Swiss-Prot record:
InterPro entries from the UniProt entry: Ribosomal_uS10, Ribosomal_uS10_CS, Ribosomal_uS10_dom, Ribosomal_uS10_dom_sf, Ribosomal_uS10_euk/arc
GO molecular function, one term: structural constituent of ribosome
Task of the protein: Involved in the binding of tRNA to the ribosomes.
One Pfam short name: Ribosomal_S10
Naturally occurring in which organism (per UniProt): Nanoarchaeum equitans (strain Kin4-M)
GO CC terms, sorted: small ribosomal subunit
The protein's name: Small ribosomal subunit protein uS10
Native organism taxonomy: Archaea, Nanobdellota, Candidatus Nanoarchaeia, Nanoarchaeales, Nanoarchaeaceae
NCBIfam families xref list: uS10_euk_arch
Oligomer status and interactors: Part of the 30S ribosomal subunit.
Amino acid sequence: MPFLRIKIYSTDLEELNRVVEKIKEIVKQTGVKMRGPIPLPTKILRVPVLRITGHRGTKIWDTYQMRIHRRIIDIATDDRTIKLLMRTPLITKPEKIQIQLKYIKDKNL
């Protein structure tokens, strides 16, 4: 049975969880099979920056980091579910959330 794989990326964990809960509500309303949300490892991007050279030539570094949280949800394909997912405004802050949809054939859910 074909299914829809939804990958969600965000730097804001609360917003990510809110979107995942909204997707779970839509799937529960339609009654299709769902697997997930599967949390993937958090990607941490670090940027070391030389702040100043201290007393006697010692170097002082600042480190800035950005955490990217990821989730995967697999949903059995159903026309009604896909239409509801596309029509419902899932994201309130689009600059913080990225969603990828992938249609996968011939795999059991």
